[in-house]
Amino acid sequence: MRRRWLAGLAVALFVLWPGSAQAHLVTTGLGPVYDGISHLFLSFDDLLPVVAMALIAGLNGPAACRRALFTLPVAWLAAGAAGYASGVAPLPAGVASVSLLLLGILTAADRKLAPSVVTALAMALGIVHGWSNGAGIAAAGREGRGLIGITVAIFVLAALVSALVVSLRRPWARIVVRVAGSWIAAIGLLLLGWTLSGRSR
């Protein structure tokens, strides 16, 4: 009995022992493209706006989905390449929280937007976050090919989420999407408050 307890304690210590933490760019050891893919799914300040954008596109129908699906990754990649080339991030720290707040509110409101408005939102989101990613990759001394991984992951995620939302026919399902938007807006408001209070660093 004592041996099992000691073995369990040893396993628990091994599993719970803190390792080194990296705040932003993740290295998987599989190359820069996979690092970019993992970056998107591990950075909620990039992941949640993409999900919110896909929810908005899905709520506004197939035409808006198709336009946003191609506009968002292309704008993200182009702005990321420009940010990588410049190496300077001129945007303030609270931009991610503002985009979360705005996109969350638009999702929760469920107002019918023209496909051109959804496309403009996707382009603005791609430019702002793409620039920030490109500048961050350059500042960390990583390869720019990580932007390709981020872009591919954005395309796949946006396609899956927006297609799911477009396929929803029941009124209660749209309410679930709106509730998700309200949670995203709440997270954005929380992050904005945190950033403005100076505790984000």
Residue positions per predicted region:
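Membrane metalloprotein/metal-transporter helix-bundle signature
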Residues: 2-201
